[in-house]
Amino acid sequence: FQTAPKGEIKEIGISTVNEHTQPGKTTEFTVYGLDEYKNRIYIAPEDVKFDVVGMEGTWSGFEFLPSGTGAYSVVATYGDNMTAVANATCYPTARLKATYPDVSIKNVGGTTKIYVSAYDTEGFGRAVTNDVTYTVANPAIGTMNGNTFTAKAKGSTYVKCSWAGQDTYVTVTVGGAAKTTAPASTSAADPLQQTVTKQNDGAFYLNITGELKYTGTGKVDANTYNAQRSRVRAAADSGADVTVYGGPCDITTPTVQDSLTWNGSYRFMNRDGASVVLLAASQGIRKTDPSQYGRFTQDIAAAGNDTIIFVTDKTPSDYPSAAEGDYFRAILNKYVQEGKTVFVVSCSGNAYWASTKDGVRYINLPDLWRADGTANKNVYMLKFRIADDGVTYQPVKV
């Protein structure tokens, strides 16, 4: 253990309380000194000079209130040019989420507390319980005081929770009454989701489809099988420089352009600012190839691209091995911390969905075929545009 008394400050460090904030909320930075034994030494805010790169805003002590949105860096300077740097973000609020969106109170006079988090357009969340405006749809059933709901009568109502232009709802049922239906929560559009149309503008255009091959045991009409595959294939090959088939594909005729097909093993493509990684995860890390994790980290580092797209057969939350899912997400988080734009495109099931969490965009592309051998009428593909000014994408129903 280090028991030496604190000495002179030899260097400084900086830590962030709220690295990811949203408009109207502050980020708190703490600057501290370190002596030669790494003892931590208090430094007052007035003794530190702050420079912010990439953002305007105002300071109050160690708290910074951004006046815009985006990513930025804070450079703290103390004494004889000792400096430390911290990165932070301030992105628009995309949606609100209640910790418990459906609650029950047994008796009149009972209470429950409502807790709300706000998530920005990059999927980072922070608590806003004390900032939310609460509105009870039917005050005869209950009232709000702060974030506490008190039941006044048997029945069911919902509480509207509003902040930063977004709303979410909490249904409250008292005394075992029939539950009422609350409106759907609001949400802001993903700023990266835009119309993608191939042009001769120097950008790289990439299309991704889900699984086109039928792998079930049902009976499939041959004419329907060929027609549906050809239809999706034509859409995937249109308006792109490269097509990625994100699942088993039994079309043997050559594509009209460059292509990459998922085959259950590791594959990597480095092309014009984008790193595309094909992974197999459905059998778990012990039954597939665990070396693929080491391989893609090396390949991505060597490529040095700002856009990283993973194409896999399962979304990480559905991995057979929870440890593998956690390990994968830790790697994804590292890329986000480095400022990369990261997509995880899973190809499974019969539904399209998309969500953003902790800076990673998770998108699922449904299979072309249902388990019984009938064609899925809810088929989507993804279109990407990757250029020096960033990446945009568009989900397209085929």
Language model features by range: what are they?
Residues 1-194, 210:
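Extracytoplasmic soluble-region selector
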Residues 23, 180-181, 214-219, 285-288, ...:
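Short, solvent-exposed loop/turn elements at domain surfaces
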Residues 175-265, 295, 323-341:
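Divalent metal-dependent phosphoesterase catalytic cores across multiple superfamilies
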Residues 194-207, 268-278, 303-309, 356-361, ...:
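Beta-strand-turn-beta hairpins that frame and shape the catalytic cleft
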Residues 199, 225, 230-239, 285-361:
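His/acidic metal-ligating clusters that form di-metal
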Residues 212-215, 248-252, 274-276, 281-286, ...:
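Solvent-exposed loop/turn segments at secondary-structure junctions
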Residues 243, 258-261, 276, 344, ...:
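Conserved beta-strand scaffold positions in the cores of enzyme catalytic domains, especially
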Residues 351-398:
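Binuclear metal-dependent phosphoesterase catalytic core
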